[in-house]
């Protein structure tokens, strides 16, 4: 007991005061939450959604037959058994990866209907403390969309959780893995339009044999320019065409495949016997290197998961098993039958096998399907960048809603033009399918491997699967993916280097931005203003309180930011009502509007200071018509009403009770304010103190229209909650000013060379070219105030 008393005396009463005052948002600041219920769909609606998913999810996978066999046998075919072996590999690759792994397993690992790499990462962040967002709090777990499980102490899941949380290196490793997969997915968004459009337009050469390849490239580039130039219009007006186009495409290739099987060589059906896979590999090194071409048959599989947000899992499962999978098997088998009978016509085998009367209609449908596939990939890239931005891993770029009906349809002009430039560069630079296919295969297999590795902790932590099932899934996936990976690695010098360069560039940007953002947050956290110092200034904060509301933006979810002390040090006045606004993103896909804002009072009521935390998910967007300011003010009024109804103590009562319980400790100094004892602090905090010469104003204007600052011998005390609400409304009518920090981050002089390069040049450059916070929050320029500071980290 004596030891505890000595320890308490050593730390001081002011330390205890600071510890109790500087608390994050507590559970009382939130709202009662609605229970989240998973949607159920009637059979008719589910079938309709399954049909619509064809146009969004399966376009990339469906256009693969245009270029697969040419990339398997770029140097010709030796015999028919070689074709049967390749077909057997295609059949079982389609069965094991898209059907078994993705449709029936990975799709279940969705984050309340959201898919993709960041969705998996968000699930992990909620079940283990590995997330990269530092300003999180336990109250965030009360959200209806923040679903997580608890574990028994000795369970395997609990051990895995402790292992992941046990070292910063493991957290960083998972982050790097996620960022790498994200960067490869962005590379996929560059390469898919290039190879899909180039392969589709290549059909012209079948009819016009003397047409040079350069002409095909020019036509492809023009189509790509048109595709990217139309992105800002959105797909809402034409998306209803996507599903019929892709459906017609699948029916076309399915029927054509069945006809070719009957017409040319039905012996290729032997490929369904897996023994031909073994025989194919016995042929030597050539068969192994051809795996890069075979792998193209499963490109677009990741879109099954990445585009999950648009459709329920059951709809995608129905569409794949009923339409996509059978039609692809028929087409690949029929194309193999044609090639087996015409071994010298591998190039453009799809178009050559077509009956002459339907060549041009098929060419039109193929080109339309390629454009639809490209559009789906481009849209997915926008979503990926948006998720990375929300999790603090990408510089702020402009995000625009292109549809009032579908919130998921977004457009980023900055990313759009970057994608277009790179896509055209790849198309015009390589000029042929082979090298682009090698690059494409590298990007796809990397994303698949990342998904496999992330699924391991998902199955253990989220699903609590038995370890034998986890091992079976991992072995089954790697059994297919590792051979493909080894094949594409051998072709790095033949175009496979392209996605690696793209990934390296985006990886550097993402990690530098995340590192700089984290360092800036750590500096703000360590240099935040002492709450005891703020309270020691009195209700007027030592300044003139003028009518109006000041919204001070900060990344801190608790405490008063350093920007505020910098502000009041350099200006003689401050607004009569202050709200510290923290806009933060959580590892959830969305935050319901009625749970978005948390409000808490700072200090006694007569300080008129509040903290408001606005929470968003990685799918949520600050829209211009959201009226963020109005929603924040409504939440503030609601908090005041609820506070008056609560039976518990108000914050000021809690503070007074706390101070009465503290022992006297004269000579405490904190935050530059020296007191002679706790009684003085109590006087500052008490609502009946009479030591302030300037009090919060009544913001009514006089007859001349000028606002007055009213001195008084006592502090303003509200007789009822109606008085405080009237005061807040009057402050709002007087004007709202948004106070943002315009900070410059510099590395300390004693920092290492690499850190100086990263912070002083790379991060500084990214901050210079990215969008300002004021633009992201849609803050009007006439009511914005920037406070400049230099942070040395």
Curated annotation (Swiss-Prot):
NCBIfam families per the UniProt record, alphabetical: kup
Spans within the Extracellular topological domain: 75-86, 194-214, 259-287, 331-351, 431-442, 490-494
Protein name, per record: Potassium transporter 18
Family per record: Belongs to the HAK/KUP transporter (TC 2.A.72.3) family.
Membrane topology, from the record: Multi-pass membrane protein
Keyword tags: Glycoprotein, Ion transport, Membrane, Potassium, Potassium transport, Transmembrane, Transmembrane helix, Transport
GO biological process: potassium ion transport
Keyword Phosphoprotein: no
Primary role: High-affinity potassium transporter.
Signal peptide start-end: none
Top-level division of the source organism's lineage: Eukaryota
Statement: the UniProt record of this protein carries the keyword Membrane: yes
Any one of the GO CC terms: membrane
Glycosylation sites: 432
MF annotations from Gene Ontology: potassium ion transmembrane transporter activity
TM region(s), chain numbering: 54-74, 87-107, 173-193, 215-235, 238-258, 288-308, 310-330, 352-372, 410-430, 443-463, 469-489, 495-515
Subcellular location, record wording: Membrane
Chief localisation class: membrane
Ranges per topology, Cytoplasmic: 1-53, 108-172, 236-237, 309, 373-409, 464-468, 516-793
């Amino acid at each position: 007991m004596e030891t505890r008393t000595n320890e308490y005396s050593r730390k001081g009463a002011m330390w205890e005061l600071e510890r109790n005052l500087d608390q994050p948002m507590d559970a009382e600041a939130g709202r009662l939450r609605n229970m989240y219920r998973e949607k159920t769909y009637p059979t008719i609606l589910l079938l309709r959604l399954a049909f619509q998913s064809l146009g969004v999810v399966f376009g990339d996978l469906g256009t693969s037959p245009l270029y697969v066999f040419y990339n398997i046998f770029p140097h010709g075919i030796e015999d028919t058994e070689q074709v049967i072996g390749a077909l057997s590999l295609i059949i079982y690759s389609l069965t094991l990866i898209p059907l078994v792994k993705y449709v029936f397993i990975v799709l279940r690992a969705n984050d309340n209907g959201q898919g993709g790499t960041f969705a998996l990462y968000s699930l992990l962040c909620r079940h283990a403390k590995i997330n990269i967002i530092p300003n999180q709090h336990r109250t965030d777990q009360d959200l209806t969309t923040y679903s997580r499980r608890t574990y028994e102490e000795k369970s395997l899941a609990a051990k895995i959780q402790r292992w992941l949380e046990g070292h910063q290196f493991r957290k960083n490793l998972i982050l790097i893995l996620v960022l790498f997969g994200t960067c490869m997915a962005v590379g996929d968004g560059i390469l898919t339009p290039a190879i899909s459009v180039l392969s589709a337009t290549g059909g012209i050469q079948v009819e016009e044999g003397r047409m040079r390849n350069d002409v095909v490239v020019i036509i492809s580039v023009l189509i790509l320019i048109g595709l990217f130039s139309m992105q800002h219009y959105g797909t809402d007006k034409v998306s209803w065409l996507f599903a019929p186009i892709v459906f017609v495409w699948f029916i076309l290739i399915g029927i054509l495949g069945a006809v070719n099987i009957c017409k040319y060589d039905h012996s290729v059906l032997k490929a369904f016997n897996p023994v031909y896979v073994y025989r194919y590999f016995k042929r030597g090194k050539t068969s192994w290197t051809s795996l890069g071409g075979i792998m193209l048959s499963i490109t677009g599989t990741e879109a099954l998961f990445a585009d999950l947000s648009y459709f329920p899992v059951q709809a995608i499962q129905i569409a794949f098993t009923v339409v996509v999978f059978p039609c692809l098997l028929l087409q690949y088998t029929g194309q193999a039958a044609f090639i087996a009978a015409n071994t010298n016509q591998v190039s453009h085998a799809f178009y050559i096998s077509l009956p002459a009367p339907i060549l041009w209609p098929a060419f039109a449908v193929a080109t339309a399907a390629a454009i639809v596939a490209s559009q789906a990939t481009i849209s997915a890239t926008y979503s990926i960048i948006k998720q990375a931005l929300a999790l603090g891993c990408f510089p702020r770029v402009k995000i625009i809603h292109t549809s009032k009906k579908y919130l998921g349809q977004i457009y980023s002009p900055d990313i759009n033009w970057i994608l277009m430039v790179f896509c055209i560069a790849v198309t015009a630079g390589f000029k042929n399918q082979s090298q682009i296919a090698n690059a494409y295969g590298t990007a796809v297999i990397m994303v698949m491997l990342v998904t496999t590795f992330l699924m391991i902790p998902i199955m253990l932590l989220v699903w609590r699967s038995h370890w034998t099932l986890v091992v079976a899934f991992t072995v089954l996936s790697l059994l297919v993916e590792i051979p493909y990976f080894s094949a594409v690695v051998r072709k790095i010098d033949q175009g496979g280097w392209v996605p690696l360069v793209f990934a390296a560039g985006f990886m550097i940007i993402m990690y530098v931005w995340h590192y700089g953002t984290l360092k800036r947050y750590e500096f703000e956290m360590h240099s935040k203003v002492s709450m005891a110092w703020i309270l020691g200034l009195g209700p007027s904060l030592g300044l003139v309180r003028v009518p109006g509301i000041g919204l001070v933006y900060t990344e801190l979810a608790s405490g008063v930011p350093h920007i505020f002390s910098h502000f009041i040090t350099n200006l003689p006045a401050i607004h009569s009502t202050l709200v510290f606004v923290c806009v933060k993103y959580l590892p959830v896909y969305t935050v319901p509007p009625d749970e978005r804002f948390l409000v808490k009072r700072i200090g006694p009521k007569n300080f008129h200071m509040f903290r408001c935390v606005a929470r968003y998910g990685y799918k949520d967007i600050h829209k211009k018509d959201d009226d963020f300011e109005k929603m924040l003010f409504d939440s503030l009024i609601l908090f005041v009403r609820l506070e008056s109804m609560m039976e518990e103590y108000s914050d000021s009562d809690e503070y007074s009770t706390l101070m009465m319980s503290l022992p006297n400790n004269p000579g405490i100094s904190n935050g530059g304010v020296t007191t002679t004892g706790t009684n003085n602090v109590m006087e500052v905090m008490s609502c009946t103190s009479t030591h302030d010469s300037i009090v919060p104003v009544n913001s009514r204007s006089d007859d001349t229209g000028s606002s007055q600052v009213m001195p008084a011998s006592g502090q303003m005390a509200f007789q009822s909650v109606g008085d405080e609400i009237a005061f807040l409304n009057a402050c709002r009518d007087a004007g709202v000013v948004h106070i943002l920090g315009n900070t410059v981050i510099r590395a300390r002089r004693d920092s290492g060379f690499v850190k100086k390069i990263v912070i002083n040049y790379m991060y500084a450059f990214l901050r210079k070219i990215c969008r300002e916070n004021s633009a992201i929050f849609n803050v009007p320029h006439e009511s914005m105030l920037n406070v400049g500071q230099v942070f040395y980290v």
